[in-house]
Amino acid sequence: MLSGLQNPRQAAAQLMNFALILSTAFMMWKGLSVATDSPSPIVVVLSGSMEPAFQRGDLLLLWNRNMWQETAVGEIVVYNVKGKDIPIVHRVVRKFGTGDKAKLLTKGDNNNADDTDLYARGQDYLERKDIIGSVVAYFPFVGYVTILLSEHPWLKTVMLGIMGLLVVIQRE
């Protein structure tokens, strides 16, 4: 089964193929980031705070269109909070001002209160720089794999093991 790896050229070719796949995925991610003007053009809904609009596990496509058009009340945005690593998907419920100086207040559709408790200490509203992007499309439950991998770390090990085994036994 592993006799094909005795040839160093075959092993090097498989390693190069694996590196090519990884670099292609990275370039596609960076290209999508540039095209959407968003550092994270794809996010997964991690909680039920936006139900019924989005369910936990939905995959969202973002576009930072606010360079051409201002964020409007009712728009669903993804934003970062200073000091927290996880982006939040919520709807804009109030807007004060225009342009880069606009102040935005957000709230999850399934939440009773607005997001002021989620914002950084001393921050009452979001600013333009806090917005990662606006939701332009979604794929239901496609991102649930990400949630499973984060909630069950042993699944990562199993998946990486299977992928590694496939690389080793693959024959050209």
From Swiss-Prot:
GO MF assignments: serine-type endopeptidase activity
Active site: 49, 90, 115
GO terms under biological process: protein targeting to ER; signal peptide processing
Top-rank taxon, per record: Eukaryota
Entry's EC annotation: 3.4.21.89
Gene3D superfamilies documented for this protein: Umud Fragment, subunit A
Transmembrane domains' residue ranges: 15-35
Cited InterPro entries: LexA/Signal_pep-like_sf, Pept_S26A_signal_pept_1_Ser-AS, Peptidase_S24_S26A/B/C, Peptidase_S26, Peptidase_S26B
Record field: catalytic activity: Cleavage of hydrophobic, N-terminal signal or leader sequences from secreted and periplasmic proteins
C-terminal short (CTS) helix, as annotated region: 158-169
Alphabetical UniProt keywords: Endoplasmic reticulum, Hydrolase, Membrane, Protease, Signal-anchor, Transmembrane, Transmembrane helix
Pfam families named in the record: Peptidase_S24
Residues on Lumenal side: 36-172
Cytoplasmic topological domain: 1-14
GO annotations of cellular component type: signal peptidase complex
Top enzyme class: hydrolase
Membrane topology: Single-pass type II membrane protein
Residue stretches in coiled coil: none
UniProt subcellular location: Endoplasmic reticulum membrane
Protein family membership: Belongs to the peptidase S26B family.
Entries under PANTHER family matching the protein: SIGNAL PEPTIDASE COMPLEX CATALYTIC SUBUNIT SEC11
Entry's free-text remark on domains: The C-terminal short (CTS) helix is essential for catalytic activity. It may be accommodated as a transmembrane helix in the thinned membrane environment of the complex, similarly to the signal peptide in the complex substrates.
Subunit structure and binding partners: Component of the signal peptidase complex (SPC) composed of a catalytic subunit SEC11 and three accessory subunits SPC1, SPC2 and SPC3. The complex induces a local thinning of the ER membrane which is used to measure the length of the signal peptide (SP) h-region of protein substrates. This ensures the selectivity of the complex towards h-regions shorter than 18-20 amino acids. SPC associates with the translocon complex.
Functional note: Catalytic component of the signal peptidase complex (SPC) which catalyzes the cleavage of N-terminal signal sequences from nascent proteins as they are translocated into the lumen of the endoplasmic reticulum. Specifically cleaves N-terminal signal peptides that contain a hydrophobic alpha-helix (h-region) shorter than 18-20 amino acids.
Name this polypeptide is given: Signal peptidase complex catalytic subunit SEC11
Gene name of this polypeptide: SEC11
